[in-house]
Amino acid sequence: GPILVQLPPHWSVNTGRLQEFLKAAPRSLRWAFEFRDPSWLCEDVFAMLQRHNAALCIHDMIADHPRRITADWVYLRFHGDHYSGSYAPDMLKAQAQWIKRQLGDGKDVFAYFNNDAQGYAVDNAKQLKRYVRG
């Protein structure tokens, strides 16, 4: 599976450092980047990721996070509200429809749940899988 590079919440955009990393990173691996500071969510970063077939991790830690596809595969991460709480079935069904469209376009989709403070992650992952296959 892919390797996730998660940046700290208050580490602002540094395209030079990202470029250095991407040039040094083995291209045989799938790299996903979870940016938690909104300054990273810009066209320069998206283009850089795309040139290296690295995925922008689409997550729910930043309000209105863009669903920008930067690779020939997709990386989704569901954190929940402060890493807890269960996702509502309607939300998971909507996510499943979006995932189905990506799969239909020939993309691999990786979806991870991190809302495990009360143990909901496994149940939510099973629900999402059922909705995608259903």
Regions flagged by a language model, labelled:
Residues 1-134:
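Residues lining hydrophobic/aromatic ligand-binding pockets adjacent to catalytic sites
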